[in-house]
């Protein structure tokens, strides 16, 4: 769809009310898969972390992963849900190449957790309560790689490759109830909700929640209701959006796209849609199925899950602090102002900041680099900052700045080098020759040359007008290509001016 076919966002909100819903898939970091003893870890050669159970081979039987059940209960409790005294698995039947046995073991009418809510902090600091309908356990499907197309999607691909390493990885799917009232802030609410869910699962320690790896994936449902109609519109489901930035952009795009169609007298097709980060657009996937289409029926090879009241209470007591309480604590510990902390929250980089501080960096320095230079590079490249560089790498750059090895200007070059894969921070410094000059000899030579070239400035400094030294300091820093400590240069400029 061309940009001309998108309605202006503000105009769309005037005409229609956005109605939202989210299905978030959280991959659990258990040692083995949900129903087999195949190892559960990211990466590995394709089709190596598999067993007959994962492939649905005749005679293979599933066994429930106890740790996955405990993780699921913990997540349900953290979402304020009721925990079912008895829940059961069901077969969700559909045919797709990444599902070897042609059904997925999931939960249908008896989920492990239900009726909860989560508090989400909006960019302006307001708290919005998002209703949670349910959280249920299931297994992940395999991964398809489409070869030959320009975008990596199935459209235009020559063929597809299937990797079943991910098949059977334990998941919890968090399903919200219908979300009304988001209005023009629907995209911001989507991003804030995903950021909050990520904070929760990371705090629980049940998932790495790295969206770029698929540990945390969002299916975003959006429909538009004409103002005053009281009727729900036809929804679309944008699948597997894998970054906070993309969630926000995808919701905004769908509102504009659907509004343009409805305003022109068209109808919305109930379908799944794929988000394309490179074009900032969604494209049609397949018709969206209803529950009846999946022909759910109880999984005959698994008994109901019946956690004891003692286990549930044990897991409840072990819950970490809530995201809201954690944020208040971190703000106080780090000494941030309200504005500084809100800037971090709005950027979606709180987890990265926590990890950088834990790696040894000062909180203010970590904030400056993540929300400043790294965010700038991420925006320029159209990606999430968290995908560019690790917290440990950022902490190592900050350490070099604190040690006086780098100036802030030089550190920006080092950050870019690390992001571009040139090595560790120290390796980039060595390879590019970026370290601050610690020998006063070259500095004095550059200072004397600058003073001789600016006799009027020299006279002003001698007359006590030390602010005039700025021109000389600038010339020296330029001559040293920024590889000098500005404070030391200033000190030497004043000394040499009086000695000349």
Curated annotation (Swiss-Prot):
Keyword check for Secreted: no
Family: Belongs to the GatB/GatE family. GatB subfamily.
Entry's Gene Ontology BP terms: glutaminyl-tRNAGln biosynthesis via transamidation; translation
Function description: Allows the formation of correctly charged Asn-tRNA(Asn) or Gln-tRNA(Gln) through the transamidation of misacylated Asp-tRNA(Asn) or Glu-tRNA(Gln) in organisms which lack either or both of asparaginyl-tRNA or glutaminyl-tRNA synthetases. The reaction takes place in the presence of glutamine and ATP through an activated phospho-Asp-tRNA(Asn) or phospho-Glu-tRNA(Gln).
Gene Ontology molecular function: asparaginyl-tRNA synthase (glutamine-hydrolyzing) activity; ATP binding; glutaminyl-tRNA synthase (glutamine-hydrolyzing) activity
A Pfam family matched in the record: GatB_N
Keyword check for Transmembrane: no
Assembly and interaction partners: Heterotrimer of A, B and C subunits.
Entry EC number(s): 6.3.5.-
Gene3D superfamilies assigned to the protein according to its UniProt record, in alphabetical order: 1.10.10.410
SMART domains per the UniProt record, alphabetical: GatB_Yqey
Keywords from the named record: ATP-binding, Ligase, Nucleotide-binding, Protein biosynthesis
Coiled-coil segments: none
Superkingdom: Bacteria
Source species of the chain: Clavibacter sepedonicus
Top EC category: ligase
Reactions it catalyzes: L-glutamyl-tRNA(Gln) + L-glutamine + ATP + H2O = L-glutaminyl-tRNA(Gln) + L-glutamate + ADP + phosphate + H(+); L-aspartyl-tRNA(Asn) + L-glutamine + ATP + H2O = L-asparaginyl-tRNA(Asn) + L-glutamate + ADP + phosphate + 2 H(+)
Gene that encodes the chain: gatB
The name this protein goes by in its record: Aspartyl/glutamyl-tRNA(Asn/Gln) amidotransferase subunit B
């Amino acid at each position: 769809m061309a940009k001309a076919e998108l309605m202006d966002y503000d105009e769309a909100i005037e005409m229609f009310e956005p109605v939202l819903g989210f299905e978030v898939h959280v991959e659990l970091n258990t040692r083995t898969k949900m129903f087999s003893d195949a190892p559960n870890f990211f990466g590995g050669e394709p089709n190596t972390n598999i067993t007959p159970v994962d492939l649905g081979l005749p005679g293979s039987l599933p066994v429930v992963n106890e740790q996955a059940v405990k993780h699921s209960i913990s997540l349900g409790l953290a979402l304020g849900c009721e925990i079912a005294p008895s829940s059961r698995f069901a077969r969700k039947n559909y045919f797709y190449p990444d599902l070897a046995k042609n059904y997925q073991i999931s939960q249908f009418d008896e989920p492990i957790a239900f009726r909860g809510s989560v508090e989400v902090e909006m960019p302006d600091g307001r708290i919005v309560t998002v209703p949670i309908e349910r959280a249920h356990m299931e297994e992940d499907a395999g991964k398809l790689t489409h070869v030959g197309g320009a975008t990596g999607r199935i459209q235009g691909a020559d063929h597809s490759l299937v990797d079943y390493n991910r098949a059977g990885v334990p998941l919890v799917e968090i399903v919200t109830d219908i979300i009304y009232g988001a209005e023009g802030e629907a995209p911001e609410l989507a991003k804030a909700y995903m950021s909050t869910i990520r904070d929760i699962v990371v705090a629980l320690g049940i998932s790495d929640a790295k969206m770029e790896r698929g540990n945390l994936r969002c299916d975003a449902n959006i429909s538009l209701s004409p103002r005053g109609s009281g009727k729900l519109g036809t929804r679309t489901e944008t699948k597997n959006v894998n970054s906070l930035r993309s969630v926000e952009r995808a919701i905004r795009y769908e509102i504009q796209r659907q509004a343009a169609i409805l305003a022109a007298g068209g109808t919305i097709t109930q379908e799944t849609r794929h988000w394309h980060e490179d074009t900032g657009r969604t494209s049609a996937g397949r018709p969206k199925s209803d529950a009846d289409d999946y022909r759910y029926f109880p999984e005959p090879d698994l008994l109901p899950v019946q956690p004891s009241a003692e286990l549930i209470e044990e897991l409840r007591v072990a819950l970490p602090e809530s995201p809201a309480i954690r944020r208040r604590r971190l703000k106080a510990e780090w000494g941030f102002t309200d504005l500084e902390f809100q800037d971090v929250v709005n950027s979606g980089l709180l987890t990265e900041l926590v990890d950088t501080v834990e790696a040894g960096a000062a909180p203010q320095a970590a904030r400056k680099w993540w929300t400043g230079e790294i965010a700038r590079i991420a925006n320029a490249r159209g990606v999430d900052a968290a995908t560019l560089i690790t917290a440990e790498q950022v902490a190592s750059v900050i350490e070099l700045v604190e040690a006086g090895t780098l100036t802030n200007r030089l550190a920006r070059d080092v950050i870019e080098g690390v992001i571009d894969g040139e090595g560790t921070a120290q390796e980039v410094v060595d390879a590019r020759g970026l370290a601050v000059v610690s020998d006063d000899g070259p500095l004095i030579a550059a200072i004397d040359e600058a003073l001789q070239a600016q006799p009027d400035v020299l006279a002003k400094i001698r007359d006590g007008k030390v602010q005039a030294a700025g021109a000389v300091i600038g010339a020296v820093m330029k001559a040293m290509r920024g590889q000098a400590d500005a404070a030391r240069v200033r000190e030497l400029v004043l000394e040499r001016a009086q000695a000349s």
